[in-house]
Amino acid sequence: MSTLGATALQFTPLDALCGGAILGVATIAKLMLTGRLLGVSASVKRPAQGEFFSWDFAFLGGLLAAGAFHVATAGPLPAEPMVGVGRALLAGSLVGAGSAMGNGCTSGHGICGNARLSPRSMAYTGVFMLVGFIAATVFDTAGALNIASASAINSTTIPSLASLSVWAAFAAASVGAFIGLGALATSGKAAGGAAYATDELSGGLVSGVQSELKPPWQPSIGPRKRLVNVVADGLVGFVFGTGLIISGMTRPVKVAGFLSALHPAWDPSLALVMGGALALCAPGFYFIQKYQKAPVCSLEFGFSSNSKLDKRLMAGGVMFGAGWGLGGICPGPSIVALAMVPSPAIFAWVGGMVLGMVVNKNLLSTRQQSSLSAASL
């Protein structure tokens, strides 16, 4: 349980919408430039399960950089209420195993999948939201985080014009940077040697992108596009992480306030975060699928055609929702929080997430081996 004083929640609709819109900008840019769907849990799961790709590290590094940059510009932050270390470890383990089983989280399914009207993503999101509400209510996550009973809606706050201006400028600068990366990737051959040199200095990480993967994840021919492919993911991580901070998603009390629907301090801000992201991603993804033949730096888009609603997907949604409701945090915000407000609880949560992903892989491998052995008898 948090040892801090009671936290009074405030309904922050514009913060949530603006932060969500910035999440949408990063998500669309990643798809247009690299052809990959943004999924934080996937970028954690691959290295956790022994698959190492440079863009995953770039993306996760961008999330960490967003947290560090916020501290550098805003100054030391007050300690953020978190559940106890043991509960955080359990919550992270459930989220890690659930996201691995369901192949996604609040970003991969909640934003990317729902923006494409994916039946799997809509089902998974519905399950983890419902279970999250139940877990937060039954196990009193609001109480564990010492959330005050005062109404959040009655304490609605609007950001200052200065804050809105900074966020708008950041979003515009991000769009400009993504456009610049796209232009760099497609402009002539003059910088080819520089790109090769950069690849050599990076220990072959950039060229590894091309040698390790097949389409749709293999970048297009040329060192420049291979380099931009990785740099783009780093910038996407930074922009996405900043959107998480602005929206309040890095604060477990905000998430728990939303999931605790029966609590007097119920805070609907989180719904507007997803709404802001989907308001951009839904038309953005439609435009990309209809009019963009290929990503800027890859051969094909990585859209999944799987629409099967199986037991593994549903079980993953249940586990993810349970962990989310118990701890009030999900993969993306947890990575940002490591650099922004590090604490034993957040390290335990992230460690639990990785553990859940590793255990899930080992159990799956054991089942597959057992099935093969049974089939050979």
Descriptions of predicted regions:
Residues M1-L377:
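Membrane-interfacial helix-loop segments of redox and metal-homeostasis proteins
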